Amino acid sequence: MKKAIWSNNWLVRLFLLFTVISAFLPSNSLAKTAKEIDASVDVAIKRFYKQVGGAEEFVKASKGMLVMPNVVKGAFIVGGEYGEGALRIGGKTVDYYNTISGSIGFQIGGESKDIILFFMTDEALKKFRASEGWEAGVDGNVALVSVGAGGRADTTTLKDPIVGFVFDAKGLIADISLKGAKFTKLDKKE
């Protein structure tokens, strides 16, 4: 009888997924204000400068940067990921975005990570901003930067239209990809 409940009841699985994700979320993280998002983005940028050697070169060379701090992923067979962040151009926030992705397969656990996408060309930035829901790998290819020994970033990717970093990962799921990540503009007021 127990086996039938676990194998046939998707509600149980969804409840467990929600429970795992909730364990990693601050109580108000799903309803952040613009001010709260900006504060989290500022902290993530400071972490980026501290953890990634050569970070300044990416910031200076980019036309804009999407900063998604504390993106949370939880999984128990079915996985989900969510986070909110800001697009900054010239050091100022111009728009707010969320990222959502889902997956099915053998997986269990949870993690939190920071994501920064650098738009290195005006065309890549324009296409991102015009999109209703921009998906990594579909609407634009992201060159994920590997951080070498001593925390130094490989700056040869500066010539790619979109460069991505996944850093400050904490948790039990070692996932540094952006596969399936969808970024959607939010309607947030100051």
Residue ranges with predicted function:
Residues 1, 27, 115:
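Short, flexible active-site loop motifs that bind/organize anionic cofactors or intermediates
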Residues 2-15:
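Bacterial N-terminal signal peptides that target proteins for export
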Residues 13-26:
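Bacterial N-terminal signal peptides
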Residues 31-190:
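Small-residue-enriched, tightly packed secondary-structure blocks
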